[in-house]
Structure formats: structure tokens, C-alpha cells
């Protein structure tokens, strides 16, 4: 019993669970329910992220569809950032901050508030890692927004955005950057971000098939 109590009161466990719960806040679902009386999990792809929110609202002719989708994107991004910010604020080790980041991503994709359903996690991914690898993340965010704006294919923008940040972790750590944001110096491996990218590919498996067969829908 003492071992269980020690485990449950361990600050690392507490913050990992907290990260999962914060990431699990279903902003897209909540806003759609409150303002439009719609269950986003039963519309389109069933995802709770900005893309499905946009498509659902546009299909109903809602005039502020893009503004609502942008709000969902920002909130999903900031919840990941907030989870990691808290772990930094309370002095958790850098490697454990990555655990909190991953927990927040899993929380978004498998929300405990929606029977473990959720979204594909890209907004939360970019938000959670921006405080850990800011240079790589900001470039990845730029690629994400640029591809999304120009090509209007959300899945491709997401994959390229996270992919860019992942590729850069094999180059940026060798530059003259502070150790506090150097994944190679602090963790000794790029594995956490690589795993996040693999997870992104898995979550977008259907989209990748559609991209390869020319069936992927654009976001208008």
C-alpha cells in the first residue's frame, strides 16, 4: 500500500497525469455543443480538431466557421503548451517535460472526457513541443501554416509541419543553442520527437492513403 501511495504522490506521475487531463480538454467538442448544439464526434471524420470543426460548420453554412475553427486550433495548441509550461514552472527534469508533452498529446487524441475519443493531435503536438525545441517547432509551425494556406490540405500541412520539426532535431542541436532547449544535450537522444512523428503518421494513415490516391479533400 505504501508503494502505491508513493507512486501516486510522485510529482512526475502527478504532472504526467495532469498533462494527460489538460490535453484531454475537448475544446472543439465543447464549443460546438455550446454554440451550435452539434456533436462534432458524430460529424465528418469524428475528430474534435479545427479541421473537422471547420468542415462541419461550413456544411451548415455558418458564417463564422473559419473564426471558430481558428479558435479551436489556438486553444488546442495552447493546452499543450500550458501543460509543458507547468512542468517547467515546477522544475521537472527536461526529459520528464517530454513525458508531460506526450501525455498531453495522448490526452487530446484519447480524451478521458469523451470515452477516449478525440482528434489527431497536431495542434497539441506543436503547442507542447514549442517550449522544448522552440527553433525546430517554430519552423515546423511556419511550414504547417504555409502549406495549409497555399495548398489547403490540412493533413499534408500537419504531416509536413511535424515532419519538419522532427528532421530539424537532427541538425539544430549541433548549433550554438542553449542546453536548456537542446534535446540531444538534455535527453541524449531525438527519440521523443521521432516517436511523436511516427504517432502523427499513424493517426493520419487514412489521409496518407487518400493523398496517394488523389482523394484527400481540401479545406476551403
Swiss-Prot record:
Pathways involved: Lipid metabolism; phospholipid metabolism
Membrane disposition: Multi-pass membrane protein
Cellular location(s): Cell inner membrane
Keyword Transmembrane on entry: yes
Its EC number(s): 2.3.1.275
Gene Ontology annotations of biological process type: phospholipid biosynthetic process
Pfam families membership: G3P_acyltransf
GO molecular function ontology, one term from the record: acyl-phosphate glycerol-3-phosphate acyltransferase activity
InterPro entries in alphabetical order: G3P_acylTferase_PlsY
Transmembrane residue ranges: 11-31, 70-90, 96-116, 127-147, 153-173, 192-212
Chief location bin: membrane
GO cellular component, one term: plasma membrane
Similarity comment text for this entry: Belongs to the PlsY family.
Subunit structure: Probably interacts with PlsX.
HAMAP family: PlsY (MF_01043)
PANTHER family cross-referenced by the UniProt entry: GLYCEROL-3-PHOSPHATE ACYLTRANSFERASE-RELATED, INNER MEMBRANE PROTEIN YGIH
Name the UniProt record assigns to this protein: Glycerol-3-phosphate acyltransferase
Native organism: Helicobacter pylori (strain J99 / ATCC 700824)
Amino acid at each position: 500500500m505504501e508503494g502505491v501511495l508513493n507512486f501516486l504522490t510522485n510529482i512526475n506521475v502527478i504532472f504526467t497525469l495532469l498533462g494527460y487531463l489538460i490535453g484531454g480538454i475537448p475544446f472543439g467538442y465543447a464549443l460546438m455543443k455550446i454554440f451550435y448544439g452539434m456533436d462534432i464526434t458524430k460529424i465528418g471524420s469524428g475528430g474534435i480538431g479545427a479541421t473537422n470543426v471547420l468542415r462541419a460548420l461550413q456544411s451548415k453554412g455558418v458564417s463564422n466557421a473559419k473564426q471558430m475553427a481558428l479558435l479551436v486550433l489556438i486553444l488546442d495548441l495552447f493546452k499543450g503548451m500550458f501543460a509543458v509550461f507547468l512542468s517547467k514552472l515546477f522544475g521537472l527534469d527536461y526529459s520528464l517535460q517530454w513525458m508531460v508533452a506526450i501525455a498531453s498529446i495522448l490526452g487530446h487524441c484519447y480524451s478521458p472526457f469523451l470515452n477516449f475519443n478525440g482528434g489527431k493531435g497536431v495542434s497539441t503536438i506543436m503547442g507542447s513541443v514549442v517550449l522544448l525545441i522552440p527553433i525546430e517547432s517554430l519552423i515546423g509551425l511556419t511550414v504547417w501554416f504555409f502549406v495549409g494556406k497555399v495548398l489547403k490540405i490540412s493533413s499534408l500541412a500537419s504531416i509536413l509541419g511535424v515532419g519538419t520539426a522532427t528532421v530539424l532535431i537532427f541538425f539544430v542541436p549541433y548549433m550554438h543553442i542553449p542546453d536548456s532547449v537542446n534535446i540531444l544535450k538534455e535527453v541524449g537522444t531525438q527519440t521523443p520527437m521521432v516517436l511523436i512523428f511516427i504517432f502523427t503518421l499513424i493517426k493520419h494513415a487514412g489521409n496518407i492513403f487518400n493523398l496517394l490516391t488523389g482523394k484527400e479533400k481540401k479545406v476551403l
